[in-house]
């Protein structure tokens, strides 16, 4: 296992099984994610969301502060995707990794952010988020990544099979509210408990636009499974967060089939950081193939 830095402040993590992850110290974005297919051919399984212009999707870490003192919700975007982090690469026999850290001040609130990226020889990419503050506040941290398991964008995501256990959802994710309205997935196109192919989801007549930005609350196991049959790639995502936002994106405004994102995040405004006590959560992506 090793990690390398290039002149553009990008760091490459790789393992002994052909996986590579390229990370930028500016914004903490994952620039490339190389995963071999069932025949051992390495390909990039990421969709570059920076190519999307309408609506614009920032590439990199997302951080937001929420103020509810007035009875309504006020959101402050920390613009972490534009922040230059201090980077510390490391490696062991079993894994390679990168630690990104930064401290920012917003209206007298000092926030220390520590982000850890770990690639293991078991083909797991682990993202660990930590933050401390000088006073209690509501803060969300996440790293949206858009996937296309066909590899090098050879095909759309319509033939991806998706499965996860969720009995409640919010669609679309509303303007911020303290008490959002949850709906039951049972009997709706949003029910993925038994697994569904994405083209059936996208073609449902209830969608007049992209079925993006749907929040799902996990039921029982916080695990998502995705399979692409042609390449044989499997991806599972497991997180310590209670739910995630499902989003889709594409190069062109007339379709939304190029990439899919599972942005693990707390249930809207339920997260509260208590000063010097670190807020911590973790998301793990595991990759394998079928023959």
Q: Where are the language model's segments positioned?
A:
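Surface-exposed acidic/polar loop and edge beta-strand patches at domain peripheries
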Residues: 1-291
């Amino acid at each position: 296992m090793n990690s390398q830095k290039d002149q553009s402040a990008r760091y490459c993590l790789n393992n002994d099984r052909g996986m590579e992850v390229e990370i930028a110290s500016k914004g903490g974005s994952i620039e490339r994610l190389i995963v071999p297919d069932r025949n051992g051919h390495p390909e990039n399984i990421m969709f570059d969301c920076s190519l999307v212009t309408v609506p614009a999707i920032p590439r990199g870490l997302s951080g937001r502060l929420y103020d509810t003192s007035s009875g309504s919700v006020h959101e402050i975007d920390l613009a972490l995707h534009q922040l230059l982090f201090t980077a510390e690469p490391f490696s062991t026999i079993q894994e390679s990794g990168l630690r990104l850290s930064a401290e920012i001040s917003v209206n007298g609130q000092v926030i220390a952010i520590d982000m850890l990226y770990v690639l293991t020889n078991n083909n797991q990419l682990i993202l660990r988020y930590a933050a401390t503050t000088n006073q209690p506040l509501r803060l969300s941290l996440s790293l949206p990544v858009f996937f296309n398991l066909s590899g090098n964008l050879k095909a759309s995501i319509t033939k991806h099979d998706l499965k996860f256990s969720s009995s409640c959802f919010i669609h679309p994710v509303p303007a911020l509210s303290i008490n959002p309205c949850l709906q039951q997935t049972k009997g709706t196109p949003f029910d993925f408990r038994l697994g569904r192919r994405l083209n059936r989801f996208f073609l449902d007549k209830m969608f007049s636009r992209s079925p993006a930005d749907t929040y799902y609350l996990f039921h029982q196991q916080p695990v998502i499974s995705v399979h692409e049959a042609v390449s044989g790639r499997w991806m599972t995502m497991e997180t310590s967060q209670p739910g995630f936002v499902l989003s889709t994106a594409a190069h062109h405004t007339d379709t939304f089939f190029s990439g899919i994102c599972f942005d693990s995040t707390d249930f809207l405004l339920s997260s509260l950081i208590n000063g010097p006590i670190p807020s911590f959560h973790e998301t793990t992506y595991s990759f394998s193939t079928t023959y």
